[in-house]
Structure formats: structure tokens, C-alpha cells
């Protein structure tokens, strides 16, 4: 039967997963009976009890007991085990919690002290292995204990001098309770200092060895802490209990109380502990919160001054009290011996502060010798404390705003410089305004600050400081983030005043500029002017071509710019060749828009096209960059064009029916901006519009065109809204893809050929050579309306009568000289016509070549009514006179 008992025990241990005693009993070879004896279980337990109680410890043994008895026998030991395990688990939990309180916690302060969470865990293991009741100096328990000690010390240092000085009866129950409690707490603190780890000042190592801690404390602050913690009230309570009350009163009558008062003053040595604890808290606040540390220092300084004044006031009254108020003391002279303690304390405090601030002697000048010496001592201490207070307060206030102080010192030097050179008043005012806008009252050594940081943090700060510039620049929005970061790290902040020339014509270009805030005007030899606003950049063409500037840029308002030197420019673009091609593409487009070209850029661009450097993704990025660069252009009408009218209002009021009547049937494969449309007056209004500064995306509001017909889908779009140009581009791109897939035979039939005017060229429907070159390589047809030598969309004038107009496919260079025609016919007629005009001119390519002839039949002749000679752009002999002027080679 014994052999059968062991398997049953093993099976029961498997059923009871939370119990370890069955397995231990089986492992040691002891039988179930031995286990039952240890647990006090009566024999005869059954198996039913083991099944009913999963957390109980029951063993099945062979015996004559019944099932019910076995079940009852199994329940009794289970209850006894749980009753014993509950307090044990609770005690273990409390012990673990208290032990964790003695270890450094994972918080902001400990992470800053030790560096990482793993280092904090390692320090916790050190505390566990250091010994019993070793307290870590950065533990939570020590933190809260120091807070309690700080409150107790402040209370003692304030209440004890008042009680000793102004209260003669010191045997009252509240006073005894306060002193006994204070002495008890300070004795506990004295004992805990022997078990608290210390910090080695030389190596910043935390010492947790109990022997080393004890020796360090005995050599440092033990004597002072022990004297300040002497339980004086315990001694007097013991003496009072052992002596007869009459004898005790007689002893007091014999002025033993004077000794007790002087002995109680030893508690004021607890000030040393207060200073130590305040210093620790200053370090904690400094490492955790920089601003809070400054506030703590201010309150600490003010509190120490008030505490010294409080002590000095109590001392002023204590000395006459110990002398039983002689007739020549200040208390007797002011007749305040029997006054209330509040009045006595007020006069004493006033007298002490008058001495310490060296402003007088208080209510009564010193007469007795003791008052005289106390007054001199008070003056010396007060003068020293006052000097320390002023020095600390001045340094603290200056440290709170050091950048503004540096700015003031710098500007004082500037004022002395202006006075030394006797600069005029207007120039001094400009210098003053520059410093105000450039530094805004604060000066930082930003270069040294950024150089002291690591690379990721420096890049993050630069990106944050230039976030507004990046948000307003389409070039950065479509660029690689690494390129943007590399570019921003090379920028230098500059400020220009209204009227300052940022760049001058003919100067060698050494910088390019990015406008963060402000408006700048581009000044060229022609009358056309252009405004640059937030997000614009200029001056890059000189850095690419190493040439001289052909235009000047002048600040119209205060401009906050970022400049980039030529060396940094080339350094960044060497690492990002795709962005160099983007700058070159924009430069070619800008030069082409003003009718100029640069052979270096064109040769390099053509070489890239021939070698197939561009891929589809880069083509899309370049298209977006060129598109946004055109939208950033802000043209200003010249003064000598009074016929410039508000085309925006005309096109916005045109009805859809009139727009449908004015559309012409021919479909154009490639179009360009008509210069006659830029300056031709609207039929509805003839009032000239003054020049205005527009937003970067509202170029069409300055030079606005009527509704136009999409050249590939015969759909009408409107240009009146500020974003109309962008909308038309987005609408046109998918339609061009559909047009590309259609056969050439699907185009509408052109009108029959008509005889041409002598001397004029045959109209042709042409495709620009540079655009064709892009198409023959990897560029798609969406690039064609945005090519470097071709404006974005066609423009036409909206009128009430619709007649077809011949399409001119020649370049500006091939426009013939005006010839005499039959009166009333052709464009050379005298009267101003209201017939709609569609004059679509191809520009000459950037390379100077004429686009090829596609063999399109010529259009019918113009109607009888024609425009006057002076208002016709087609008859202008000077093709450059009507070209829009844009900034080039800045």
C-alpha cells in the first residue's frame, strides 16, 4: 500500500498546479503521512477533497476513511495553509515595496544622472548587494525624507528663536510636544546618515559600502549634526520627573533657565543641514528644469536674508532679556517690558533691519554698552549679507537674459562708433533700424552654438529655423530632403532695408539669395519690372555660368534673406547632380523668357538630352519646378503702356455663350504666348490698371488673358482666378496623352488656302525644336507646354462677334515688314476692329533655329476691319520691343 501511496501523491501534485509541497515531499522520498503530519492534517483524507479544492494541499492515503470524511479532512488543512500564507505574502509584498523605495527609481532625474535605464537597473542591483538597509542617495525614500527634513528645519529655525526669546514659560504641552517631535526626527536623521550612500566629489561615484559611509560621515558633519540634535527637552523632562517640583522651581528661580535657553540655541546649528539640503534641491532642479533652478535660487537667497533678519531681531531682544532688562536698554527706554510679544517682536525686527540695511538705529539709538556692541555686530552682518544679496541678484538677473545684455553692450559700441566718426542723423537712424530688424534686441553666437551640437540635432534645428522658407519655395518642396538639409545648413541669414541694392548690374556674382520675407524689385535696362516675394530666389545663373550680373535687385521692403556662396553652392550640387540640372533648366527657361541665351547652359543641356540622362521621374520633377518657377514670376506693367487694361474683370464677366461663339475651330499642336494679347486693350474697358504687387501664384492677375481653348481637347478654361494657370496645366496634361494616341487624320480640316499678302511668310503649324528634342528622348508630351523656350498656354481676346483668324506659325524673327494693303482688308486697315483675334506666335528657339514646317494649309485672310498700326504687335518691326522682360542671369 505504501507503493501505491506515492503515485497518488504525484498525481495530486499534478492536479494542484499552485502547490509546491507535494512535489517537495515526493522528491525528498517522504511519504504522504509525513507531509500530513507537518501540515497537521488528520489521516484518512480522500481524493474528492483534492478535486474540489484546486489551491489546497491535500494528499490521498490508503485507509479506511470514507469519501465524505476524506473530503472533510481535505478542507481543514487547506484553510489553515491559506491563513498562514496570506500574512506571509502581504509581508513579502510590503518588504519588496519598501526595498524598492531605497533604490533609485526610473525617472527623469535618475536617467539624466546614470544615462540610461539599463544603468539605473545596474545601480539598483548594487543597492541590493550593498547590505541591509543601505539607502541610495537618489532613491525615492531619501527624496521624501529630505523634503520632510527641509520642512522641519525651516520650522525649527523660525519657531525656536521666537519661543526662546519672547516666551518665558517653556513647560507648556504644545511647546514640549513640538520640541520632542523635532528632536526625535533629527535623531532619526542622524542615524539614517550612517546608512545613506555618499557621492564622491572627485569621481562622482556613489559609495554604498557601509564602512566607508560611516567613516566619511564621522569626518565631515557628524559633530555639528550631533550637537544640533541633542535632546534638550528629553533631559529637562527627566530632570523634572526625578526632582521635586519645588526644587525644580527653585532651580529655575536660580536662573538655570538661562542655561537652557543658551543650550537650546544649539539647535540653530541645524542651519548647516538646511543649507546642504537646499543645495541638493538646487542641483535637482537645475538638472531637471533649468528655469525652475533659477527660481529656486532667487527664493533661496530671499529666504536666507529674511531668516537672518529674523534671528537678528530675536537677538536684539534676547540680550536685554538675559540681563533682566536694565534701565538703559532699548526695551526699558521704550517702556515695552510688559507689552505683548507681538509688539516686542515688531520693534526688535524693525531695529534689526535698520541696522542691517545701515539706514538708522531703529526707534531708539543704542545707549547701553551691550546694545552698542549688538548694533555694530548687526551692521557688519547686514552689510555683508546686503552685498552678497545684491551681487547674487545681479548675476542671476543677468544670467536670465544674457542675450539681451550682449545686444545692449554691442549697441553701445555702435553708438560710440557713430559718434566718433560723426555720422549724420539719417545714417544713424538707418543703422539703428538695421540692428533692430537684424537682431531684434538679442544677440546669439549662433555659429558656435550649432558647432557644439551633433549633426542630427544641428540638422533638426536648421530645418526648424528655415521651415517657413522651405514651405514657400517650390524648389525645396520637389527636392530630395537630404538636398534640402544640405542646402539649408550652408545658408547665411541676412537683412536688407528698403532701398538697398542686394545685387548690382555688372558685378561678379558670388552669392545667390532666397527670400524668406519681403518684396524685392528687379531693375533692368528695359521698362519692364518684376517683383520677387516670399519663396523666390535669384542670382543662381551667375553661379552656374560664372558671369556678371545683367540686372539689379533692390529691396522694396525689409527683406529677410538667406544667402548661399558660390563655393557652398557648387559643393552641394556636386553631391546632387539632378538638382544641378534643375537649376540649369530653370536658368535656361528664365533666359528664354527674356529672349536671351547662354551657350554654356544650352550646350550642357543639349548634351544631357542626347545622352539620355533624364529619366521619367526626373522629368516630372523638372516639369513641376519649371511650372512653379513661372508661377512665382510677378510682372509689373511699364509706365509707357497706358493702354494696359484690366483683362481680369473682362474675362471674368464674359458669359459662356460668348466664349463659345469666339472660339475658332482649328486645333493647334503647339502654342505660345501672343505679345499682342499682353498689351491689347479689352473691348469692354479702357481704364489702365496701376502696377501692383501680387502673390507668388497670381501671375495671371497682372497679365490676364480671356478664356482660351485647350489646343488638344477643344475645352474652354478661364484665367481670371489666381490659380487658373495651374488649373489649366493640370487639365491639359491628361488630354495631351489622349491626343498623342490619336492618329493624325482625326484632326479637323483646316480652311482652304488663301492668297497671302506680298512679303509675308506662309503660316505654318510648327513644333518647337527644343520641345521636339525633349520628346525624342525620354521626355513625354506633357513637358512640351513647359519647355524652356515656350510659354505655357495660348491666349485670345474675347469679343462678341466670332470670325476665324489666321494662325501664324512663324517665329518673331521671321515677322515681315508692314506693307500697304487694299483699304478695308487685312490687318493693315486703319479702324480699330472688334473682330476677335487669335494671334498665336512661335518664339524662336533658344538655340536660334527656326522650327520645321509641318505643311499645314494656310488660314484664310483676316477680316476687313483691322487694328490700327500703332496697336498691332504683329506689324511691329522690332520683335524685342514687345517681349516681356523677366529676370535673367541675376
Swiss-Prot record:
Outcome, altering residue 391 to D? In DEE24; results in absence of hyperpolarization-activated currents; reduced amount of protein at the cell membrane
In the record, the effect of residue 329 to S is given as: In GEFSP10; decreased current density; voltage-dependence of activation as well as the activation and deactivation kinetics are not altered
In terms of Gene3D superfamilies, this protein maps to: 1.10.287.70, Helix hairpin bin (1.10.287.630), Jelly Rolls (2.60.120.10)
Consequence of changing residue 401 to H: In DEE24; results in a gain of channel function
Sorted keywords for this record are: cAMP, cAMP-binding, Cell membrane, Disease variant, Epilepsy, Glycoprotein, Ion channel, Ion transport, Ligand-gated ion channel, Membrane, Nucleotide-binding, Potassium, Potassium channel, Potassium transport, Sodium, Sodium channel, Sodium transport, Transmembrane, Transmembrane helix, Transport, Voltage-gated channel
Q: How does it sit in the membrane?
A: Multi-pass membrane protein
Chain intervals with Gly residues compositional bias: 62-77
The record lists the effect of residue 414 to M as:
In GEFSP10; results in a depolarizing shift of the half-activation voltage and faster activation kinetics
Function recorded in the entry: Hyperpolarization-activated ion channel that are permeable to sodium and potassium ions. Displays lower selectivity for K(+) over Na(+) ions. Contributes to the native pacemaker currents in heart (If) and in the generation of the I(h) current which controls neuron excitability. Participates in cerebellar mechanisms of motor learning. May mediate responses to sour stimuli.
Indicate what this protein is called per its UniProt record.
Potassium/sodium hyperpolarization-activated cyclic nucleotide-gated channel 1
Source organism phylogeny: Eukaryota, Metazoa, Chordata, Craniata, Vertebrata
Amino acid at each position: 500500500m505504501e507503493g501505491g501511496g506515492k503515485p497518488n501523491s504525484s498525481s495530486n501534485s499534478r492536479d494542484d498546479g499552485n502547490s509546491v509541497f507535494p512535489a517537495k515531499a515526493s522528491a525528498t522520498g517522504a511519504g504522504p503521512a509525513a507531509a500530513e503530519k507537518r501540515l497537521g492534517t488528520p489521516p484518512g483524507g480522500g481524493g474528492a477533497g483534492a478535486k474540489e479544492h484546486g489551491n489546497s494541499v491535500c494528499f490521498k492515503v490508503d485507509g479506511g476513511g470514507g469519501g465524505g470524511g476524506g473530503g472533510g479532512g481535505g478542507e481543514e488543512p487547506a484553510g489553515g495553509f491559506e491563513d498562514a500564507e496570506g500574512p506571509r505574502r502581504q509581508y513579502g509584498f510590503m518588504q519588496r515595496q519598501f526595498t524598492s523605495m531605497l533604490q533609485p527609481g526610473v525617472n527623469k532625474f535618475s536617467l539624466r544622472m546614470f544615462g540610461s535605464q539599463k544603468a539605473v537597473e545596474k545601480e539598483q542591483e548594487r543597492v541590493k548587494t550593498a547590505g541591509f538597509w543601505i539607502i541610495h542617495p537618489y532613491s525615492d525614500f531619501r527624496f521624501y525624507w529630505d523634503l520632510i527634513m527641509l520642512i522641519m528645519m525651516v520650522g525649527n529655525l523660525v519657531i525656536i528663536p521666537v519661543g526662546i526669546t519672547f516666551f518665558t514659560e517653556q513647560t507648556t504641552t504644545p511647546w514640549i510636544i513640538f520640541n520632542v517631535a523635532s528632536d526625535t526626527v533629527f535623531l532619526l536623521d542622524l542615524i539614517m546618515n550612517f546608512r545613506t550612500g555618499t557621492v564622491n566629489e572627485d569621481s562622482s561615484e556613489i559609495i554604498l559600502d557601509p564602512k566607508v559611509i560611516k567613516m566619511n560621515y564621522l569626518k565631515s558633519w557628524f559633530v555639528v549634526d550631533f550637537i544640533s540634535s541633542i535632546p534638550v527637552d528629553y533631559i529637562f523632562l527627566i530632570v523634572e520627573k526625578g526632582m521635586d517640583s519645588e526644587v525644580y522651581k527653585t532651580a529655575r528661580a536660580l536662573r538655570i533657565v538661562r542655561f537652557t535657553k543658551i543650550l537650546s540655541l544649539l539647535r540653530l546649528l541645524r542651519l548647516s543641514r538646511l543649507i546642504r539640503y537646499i543645495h541638493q534641491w538646487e542641483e535637482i532642479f537645475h538638472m531637471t528644469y533649468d528655469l525652475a533652478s533659477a527660481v529656486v535660487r532667487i527664493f533661496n537667497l530671499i529666504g536666507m536674508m529674511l531668516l537672518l533678519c529674523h534671528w537678528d531681531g530675536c537677538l536684539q531682544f534676547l540680550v536685554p532679556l538675559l540681563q533682566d532688562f536694565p534701565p538703559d536698554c532699548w526695551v526699558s527706554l521704550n517702556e515695552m517690558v510688559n507689552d505683548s510679544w507681538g509688539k516686542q517682536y515688531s520693534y526688535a525686527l524693525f531695529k534689526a533691519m535698520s541696522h542691517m540695511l545701515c539706514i538708522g538705529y531703529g526707534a531708539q539709538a543704542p545707549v547701553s554698552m551691550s546694545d552698542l556692541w549688538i548694533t555694530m555686530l548687526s551692521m557688519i552682518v547686514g552689510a555683508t549679507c546686503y552685498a552678497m544679496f545684491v551681487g547674487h541678484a545681479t548675476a542671476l538677473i543677468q544670467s536670465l537674459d544674457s542675450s539681451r545684455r550682449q545686444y545692449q553692450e554691442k549697441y553701445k559700441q555702435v553708438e560710440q562708433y557713430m559718434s566718433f566718426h560723426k555720422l549724420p542723423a539719417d545714417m544713424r537712424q538707418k543703422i539703428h533700424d538695421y540692428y533692430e530688424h537684424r537682431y531684434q534686441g538679442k544677440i546669439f553666437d549662433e555659429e558656435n552654438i550649432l558647432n557644439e551640437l551633433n549633426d542630427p540635432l544641428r540638422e533638426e534645428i536648421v530645418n526648424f529655423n528655415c521651415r517657413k522658407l522651405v514651405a514657400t519655395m517650390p524648389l525645396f518642396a520637389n527636392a530630395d530632403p537630404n538636398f534640402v538639409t544640405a542646402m539649408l545648413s550652408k545658408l547665411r541669414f541676412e537683412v536688407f532695408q528698403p532701398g538697398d541694392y542686394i545685387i548690382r548690374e555688372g558685378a561678379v556674382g558670388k552669392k545667390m539669395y532666397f527670400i524668406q520675407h519681403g518684396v524685392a524689385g528687379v531693375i533692368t535696362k528695359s521698362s519692364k519690372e518684376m517683383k520677387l516675394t516670399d519663396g523666390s530666389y535669384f542670382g543662381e545663373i551667375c553661379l552656374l555660368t560664372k558671369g556678371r550680373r545683367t540686372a539689379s535687385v533692390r529691396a522694396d521692403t525689409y527683406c529677410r534673406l538667406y544667402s548661399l556662396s558660390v563655393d557652398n553652392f557648387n559643393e552641394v550640387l556636386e553631391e546632387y547632380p539632378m538638382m544641378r540640372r534643375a537649376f540649369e533648366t530653370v536658368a535656361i527657361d528664365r533666359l528664354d523668357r527674356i529672349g536671351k541665351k547662354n551657350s554654356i547652359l544650352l550646350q550642357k543641356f543639349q548634351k544631357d538630352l542626347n545622352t539620355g540622362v533624364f529619366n521619367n521621374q526626373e522629368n516630372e520633377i523638372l516639369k513641376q519646378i519649371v511650372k512653379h518657377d513661372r508661377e512665382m514670376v510677378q510682372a509689373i506693367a511699364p509706365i509707357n503702356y497706358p493702354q494696359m487694361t484690366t483683362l481680369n474683370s473682362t474675362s471674368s464677366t464674359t458669359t459662356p455663350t460668348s466664349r463659345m461663339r469666339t472660339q475658332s475651330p482649328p486645333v493647334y499642336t503647339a502654342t505660345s504666348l501672343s505679345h499682342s494679347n499682353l498689351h491689347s486693350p479689352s473691348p469692354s474697358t479702357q481704364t489702365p490698371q496701376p502696377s501692383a504687387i501680387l502673390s507668388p501664384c497670381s501671375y495671371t492677375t497682372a497679365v490676364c488673358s480671356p478664356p482660351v481653348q485647350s489646343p488638344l481637347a477643344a475645352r474652354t478654361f478661364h484665367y481670371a482666378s489666381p490659380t487658373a494657370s495651374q488649373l489649366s496645366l493640370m487639365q491639359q496634361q491628361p488630354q495631351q496623352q489622349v491626343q498623342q494616341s490619336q492618329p493624325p487624320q482625326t484632326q479637323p480640316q483646316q480652311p482652304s488656302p488663301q492668297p497671302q499678302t506680298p512679303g509675308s511668310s506662309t503660316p505654318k503649324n510648327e513644333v518647337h525644336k527644343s520641345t521636339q528634342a525633349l520628346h525624342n528622348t525620354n521626355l513625354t508630351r506633357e513637358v512640351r507646354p513647359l519647355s524652356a523656350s515656350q510659354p505655357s498656354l495660348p491666349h485670345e481676346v474675347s469679343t462678341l462677334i466670332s470670325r476665324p483668324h489666321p494662325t501664324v506659325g512663324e517665329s518673331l524673327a521671321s515677322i515681315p515688314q508692314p506693307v500697304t494693303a487694299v483699304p478695308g482688308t487685312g490687318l493693315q486697315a486703319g479702324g480699330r476692329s472688334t473682330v476677335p483675334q487669335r494671334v498665336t506666335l512661335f518664339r524662336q528657339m533658344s538655340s536660334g533655329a527656326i522650327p520645321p514646317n509641318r505643311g499645314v494649309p494656310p488660314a484664310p485672310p483676316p477680316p476687313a476691319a483691322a487694328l490700327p498700326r500703332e496697336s498691332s504687335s504683329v506689324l511691329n518691326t522690332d520683335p524685342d520691343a514687345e517681349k516681356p522682360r523677366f529676370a535673367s542671369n541675376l
